Amino acid sequence: MSEAEYLGGRLLLAMPGMGDPRFDHAVIAMCVHDEHGALGIGVGHVREGITLHGLLEDVGIDPGLAPDMPVLNGGPVETARGFVLHSDDWGGEGSVTVNGLCCLSASLDILRAIAEGRGPSRFVIALGYAGWGGGQLEGEMRRHGWYAAQGRPEILFETPTGRRWTQAWKREGIDPAHLVGQTGSA
């Protein structure tokens, strides 16, 4: 793939019938994608039983001014590792800009900043990530497992979690009710 074809900054949308129940109706914010592999954070499903306040308390941070919002299921890899996708109005050590979609931070500094009311204006927090080895994601896309939608910050930050998959399809001009779970060949 050429650099222009890599998917960093895009939203991966799981196709119906992709065959992996962990990714049913998944929306993955693609953070890194190159010849060595890919890493994305799931933003389409809530991690049951944990909120931001609980997460902050678990890592020894007083929730303070942080909203008590749901924590997302970022993916099946390193499910105890936290990630914050956020607006570019906050930057700390290790923050990475993701091609116009958002910034990615994974340090306790951003959690402290959020709790103290000096964090980014918009953010989502997830535990875990989705990862692919070199060429693996491309193979899954050839088998019609994923659709690469435009990375739209309004889908990430303004659309309710449970509606992100449907709304991302609609913003692409596709009615997801017309998608089928099987592909064919002529």
Curated annotation (Swiss-Prot):
Disulfide bonds: none annotated. InterPro entries: AlgH-like. GO terms for cellular component: cytosol. Pfam families: DUF179. Belongs to the UPF0301 (AlgH) family. This is UPF0301 protein Saro_0683.
